[in-house]
UniProtKB/Swiss-Prot annotation:
Keyword Magnesium tagged: no
Membrane topology annotation: Peripheral membrane protein
Record's subunit section: F-type ATPases have 2 components, CF(1) - the catalytic core - and CF(0) - the membrane proton channel. CF(1) has five subunits: alpha(3), beta(3), gamma(1), delta(1), epsilon(1). CF(0) has three main subunits: a, b and c.
Protein name: ATP synthase epsilon chain
Gene: atpC
Native species: Geobacillus thermodenitrificans (strain NG80-2)
């Protein structure tokens, strides 16, 4: 079966590099499935799991926003943060989730609710992806 090259890159460096049969991501416009030979495309990404399918197996990468660039022979995910499912520290992700929930529940005026909501989404995404490995 044909494959397409995938790179998941963050400001800290590469997270994933390999050839897969299909890439599935959640863009702002909805769910996208990319196969080899896909038309060129650039799309902003949601905080979600990128699913990388090869040989009947699926690998998961927690992606915290960013952009997807598709060319017929290559997919690049430029993310603010990304972690492979097997690399996620579940205890750290749970602690981040609890911190974000406490910030959202506090009644202080100086709390930036949008930032706290994003932190909660990122932590929940990491926990969900860690459970997929």
């Amino acid at each position: 079966m044909k494959t397409i090259r995938v790179s998941v890159v963050t400001p800290d460096g590469p997270v994933y590099e390999g050839d897969v049969e299909m890439v599935s991501v959640k863009a702002k416009s909805g769910e996208l499935g990319i196969l080899p030979g896909h038309i060129p495309l650039v799309a902003p990404l949601e905080i979600s799991a990128a699913r990388l399918k090869k040989d009947g197996k699926t690998s998961y990468v927690a992606v915290s926003g960013g952009f997807l660039e598709v060319r017929p022979d290559k997919v690049t995910i430029l993310a603010q943060a990304a972690e492979r499912a097997e690399d996620i520290d579940v205890l750290r992700a749970k602690a981040a989730k609890e911190r974000a929930e406490r910030r959202l529940q506090s009644q202080q005026d100086d709390i930036d609710f949008k930032r706290a909501e994003l932190a909660l989404k990122r932590a929940m995404n990491r926990l969900n992806v860690a459970g997929m490995k």
